[in-house]
Amino acid sequence: GNKGCGTKKSLEEFRNNWQLPLRAAFSDRIYNTDKFLVDGEWASCFGHIDAIHSGEFMGIAPTNKRVKIHYTDFWEVKDGLIIDNWVTVDFPSILSQLDVDVFNGQGWEAYDRGEIAPAKPN
């Protein structure tokens, strides 16, 4: 997955290093699949989890704020078995909801607000 997700090579690693930490950091989780797509041996979905930030997350103490965790999930399936899985999670959005600006005010939203002007292309 994207930076911050890490790489899991087994179901045990997924459970111990993804699922359990997520559950420890976010309670009252409601999972929402917005769209599910299939194309041959590939399947994908995107959606979000509504949850309460009730445990430590990436070094941030619990805030008890309700957050929306956007994700995409891709699976490669052969002979009825998942042989690969790629997940992306919108960590900058989660952190922003917890009042952490990972872009230090320099995200492209600053262009939208007119705070900075884009550089001219070379």
Describe the residue ranges of each PLM region.
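C-terminal and inter-domain tail/linker signature
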Residues: 1-122
